[in-house]
């Protein structure tokens, strides 16, 4: 009997502090940084973002999204036998204990299930789903909780208008389970460390002292050029693995980073924007959280229906990129 992995629950969470472009523009202006709603929207498509309050960690956002995914899947916390959490903003400096372990504790899971973090920045969720898919198909795990959670507001430089207007905080989650029905149809992952310096957090720690910048750095034009190229290729690779054509894709959910990159992705696949779930305008770039958040929106508002084929693709620092083609 062939075992497949299938997404049976989705969930998402945004912290309540919503900051519009107008509000952020006013805040930046008070510090001598000039920008405008028109400038932000024209370059990114972003109208607002959400920021976590002080003391709220990635794990707190992750727990809320996970609860909603479990509720949709009609599973209890101790039905989970593996947690894979994608984040670039872990609860603890240095990354341990892992944020996945913190989420396990906060959810009240008592079965000693495996828990691990994945770090591939904005590609993290796609990487995590691919890992979960392989664990399930191998028969070692049945119910896997996959989460993307970020508090990027902690690592952006509010004196750099080219990046501080783009990012926000949030979390998204899916519950993947073993199934006799096809679910995940194909996954494909890539990385190229030669491009590591175009999107990075360059600071290093030596004996408790940060050497270099502790804020995110991004070469916007270089990221745009590379992202458009690799997203097109990896989507077609996933389709080839599944033996499908782009016309069979019902919905495309790219990493919600920049509307211009997303438009280019749809065009190169020969799909209209009416086939794309777009949420970037409401929460900005939430890194590893953006794809599962958009997926959850599409499922809950009824656009994404059972049996439909969804292409999810991400690109992020490292440089990393990947795609997942799944039947819902």
From Swiss-Prot:
Record field: catalytic activity: malonyl-[ACP] + acetyl-CoA + H(+) = 3-oxobutanoyl-[ACP] + CO2 + CoA
Top enzyme class: transferase
Subcellular location: Cytoplasm
Top-rank taxon: Bacteria
Cellular component, GO annotation: cytoplasm
GO molecular function: 3-oxoacyl-[acyl-carrier-protein] synthase activity; beta-ketoacyl-acyl-carrier-protein synthase III activity
One Pfam family hit: ACP_syn_III_C
GO biological process: fatty acid biosynthetic process
EC number: 2.3.1.180
UniProt-annotated catalytic positions: 122, 255, 285
UniProt keyword annotations, A-Z: Acyltransferase, Cytoplasm, Fatty acid biosynthesis, Fatty acid metabolism, Lipid biosynthesis, Lipid metabolism, Multifunctional enzyme, Transferase
Pathway per the UniProt entry: Lipid metabolism; fatty acid biosynthesis
Ranges where the record places region ACP-binding: 256-260
PANTHER family, per database record: 3-OXOACYL-[ACYL-CARRIER-PROTEIN] SYNTHASE (PTHR43091), BETA-KETOACYL-[ACYL-CARRIER-PROTEIN] SYNTHASE III, CHLOROPLASTIC (PTHR43091:SF1)
Protein family: Belongs to the thiolase-like superfamily. FabH family.
UniProt free text on domains: The last Arg residue of the ACP-binding site is essential for the weak association between ACP/AcpP and FabH.
Subunit structure and binding partners: Homodimer.
Task of the protein: Catalyzes the condensation reaction of fatty acid synthesis by the addition to an acyl acceptor of two carbons from malonyl-ACP. Catalyzes the first condensation reaction which initiates fatty acid synthesis and may therefore play a role in governing the total rate of fatty acid production. Possesses both acetoacetyl-ACP synthase and acetyl transacylase activities. Its substrate specificity determines the biosynthesis of branched-chain and/or straight-chain of fatty acids.
HAMAP family: FabH
Protein name: Beta-ketoacyl-[acyl-carrier-protein] synthase III
Species the sequence originates in: Janthinobacterium sp. (strain Marseille) (Minibacterium massiliensis)
Gene assigned in the entry: fabH
